[in-house]
Amino acid sequence: MLSSFPVVLLETMSHYTDEPRFTIEQIDLLQRLRRTGMTKHEILHALETLDRLDQEHSDKFGRRSSYGGSSYGNSTNNVPASSSTATASTQTQHSGMSPSPSNSYDTSPLPCTTNQNGRENNDRLSTSNGKMSPSRYHANSMGQRSYSFEASEEDLDVDDKVEELMRRDSSVIKEEIKAFLANRRISQAVVAQVTGISQSRISHWLLQQGSDLSEQKKRAFYRWYQLEKTNPGATLSMRPAPIPIEDPEWRQTPPPVSATPGTFRLRRGSRFTWRKECLAVMESYFNENQYPDEAKREEIANACNAVIQKPGKKLSDLERVTSLKVYNWFANRRKEIKRRANIAAILESHGIDVQSPGGHSNSDDVDGNDYSEQDDSTSHSDHQDPISLAVEMAAVNHTILALARQGANEIKTEALDDD
């Protein structure tokens, strides 16, 4: 690829004592520039014109060094000036570029930016003595416009629609989204994979159950909805950016806000691994009641934290058991029992004898919770002693809490009797 460099590059850099080194991007841009049909003298003339414009506007816009730095400035001084005229064939090779009748330079800046409609202002030129001189639009932006600027108008339109959805009644939008998913046959697992929102949160939100989604997650969900409606299947190849946005109980620091429209910056939360001591406590409570209420879940969480709490050390947010984690564990436990019961029914229908579908589960819940499977072997070794101890401690903790509530009620009753 180096052998195909234009001769102008070798002449320009001949004063270097060492062989110049170029990046792949620079080589690609030089090749693109040469393929536009510009000659060596036209390229040098354009670069000299840009240098002169930078010098004239340095007081107003500051000195710029975006054309190769100081090394370029030294190299262009050693190159003779090009021809004073530009051929008509060269002028016609630049679409949208026509020479200005003015003999003076345009003193207004010519930035390489996009307007609100996503179109580049690449049709503005500064001329000298009726000759065309390329504007301050260099090859670097030519390589970028094909993939970074064309979607700006669509992004703005999607943002407007997302804001409109945020202002509408969420219950109506949920019905629309459910119908959309059913008609397109899009599973909630696919939506969860693209947006980074857990499947259970999506399911509960669409079914009007549980807490509402946060504003940022709701915007990400609505953005996916609008993009999928506009371009069916386009979002299926998207993946969330690697910036974690987790549930409020799991969050330790405020999440960063995405500044780039059209990107999803949501990801599933970290996985929580249940310790054996906590599993023993959970199993004991599960055997008593498979559907604990909020107060009971708080009690179970406190019992688990008391078991794993080490003296003089505070549990971190990742280690601490919360009522939400208890809720997910119980839901997964019931789901696993039901799944095993269904499997057992299928096997029995084929005349295969199976054991009770009970037992322990090691399946992951849809929110990313993970707990270890208990050892169902008949051997009872010393490593099970901590579990037995955990069960006893949980029972003691449960008794203490019950006595504390009973004692408080008795104190209130005695106070009323004294009055």
From Swiss-Prot:
Stored Pfam families: HNF-1_N (PF04814), Homeodomain (PF00046)
UniProt entry tagged with the keyword Ubl conjugation: yes
Cellular localisation: Nucleus; Cytoplasm; Chromosome, Telomere; Nucleus, Cajal body
Positions of the POU-specific atypical domain: 145-241
Family matches, as PROSITE patterns: HNF_P1, HOMEOBOX_2, POU_4
Identification of the protein by name: Homeobox-containing protein 1
Principal location listed in the UniProt entry: nucleus
Ranges where the record places region Disordered: 56-152, 352-384
